[in-house]
Amino acid sequence: MKQNITVVSLGPGDPELLTAQSLNTMKKAKRLIFRTAQHPVYAVLTEAGVQSTSLDDYYDRYEDFDEMHRDMAKALWTEAEHHAVVFAVLDAGTDGAVRELRAQQPQDAVLRILPGVTLADACIAQLPGNLAPIGALRTIPAEDA
């Protein structure tokens, strides 16, 4: 079986900001894995009867985020040897585990990343027009700062 992972960006927390494409992908997933269950979309999908797991236990096992991200990606690619995987994260564009998925991607494997509303998008939308840094904003994950 060709390894296949689809990454879904969950967004800043409001389930209504989730894209229809991402929601449908998660509902149809045979193997849905959340980076963390500490996201409102996890609760909404669980209440709707969608089966999933999370990688929350990694946070207790690791002190080094780089090592944690490497091992998350390794575990996801291993799981993808048996099932197509949907991996749900806050923001695929800034997530360290997603960066590692790209770095570790086997030659014949498929890695698909679905876009979503970012935390920065949600914050900027709340700013008054004269303060919104349209085109002049650079986001850096705290772990990289």
Model feature map: region roles:
Residues 1-15, 20-114, 122:
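Class I S-adenosyl-L-methionine
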Residues 102-127, 132-142:
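Short, acidic/small-residue loops that bind anionic groups at enzyme active sites
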